[in-house]
Amino acid sequence: MNRCRLETIRAYWSGRVAAYSAVNADELGTIQAKVWDELIAEQLPWKHPLRILDAGCGPGFFSILMARRGHEITGVDYSEAMIECARENVENHSPEASAYFSQMDAQNLTFEDDTFDVVLSRNLTWNLEHPDRAYAEWLRVLRPGGVLLNFDANWHAHLFDPELARLYAEDAQTLRAMGYAVEDEHGDPIMDELIPQLPLSREQRPGWDKACL
């Protein structure tokens, strides 16, 4: 693994803690949080409290939702700043929660095999240098019969596919015509450098993920 690249990714997200946490906090106050909560709950057939790993937990959005349901949460993130933020957010939103947070690389977990009933992740795998290794680790720590739920997207595929670039531009134009502000994706020098180096930037998903699993 390129340790320098991993540290660059950590530094980038550590620098975005306050802004990203604010976005998550706003989302918790909208119908979108209920949609996420019910979507996940539909995939979990068990009624008893579950041991859940929130991989790449960030400021703790999924951890808060699952803690509210009484599950035992373990959140990991490579950014220590994100971990501290997640701890604080869970304490504020769900003070009675059973939640533990640890700074850890989601591609190299230190947990024993078959530790968790559920592995959750959102908007993480596109950041990873070795997403295939992350999937292998998540399956390793997932008990037999457990559930893996990963929510991610083709965030940057349009930068490498002309047809997707055309559709992206059309969508942006439509949104601007409707009065919405569309931010220029470029401009952050760290991401501009990292995106071409990350393997999932050029992959079509979820096709790649299904093949990997």
For each predicted feature, which ranges?
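Conserved class I S-adenosyl-L-methionine
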Residues: 1-48, 61-65, 147-187
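Class I SAM-dependent methyltransferase SAM/SAH-binding core
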Residues: 53-55, 59-108
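Short N-terminal helix/helix-N-cap motif within the alpha/beta-hydrolase-1
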Residues: 81, 128-133, 158
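A short acidic, Gly/Pro-enriched loop at the edge of an enzyme's catalytic core
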Residues: 107-118
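A short SAM/SAH-binding and catalytic strip from SAM-dependent methyltransferases
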Residues: 118-131
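A short glycine-rich, Lys/Arg-flanked "PGG" loop and its adjoining helix->strand segment in the class I
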Residues: 132-144
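Short alpha-helix
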Residues: 200-213
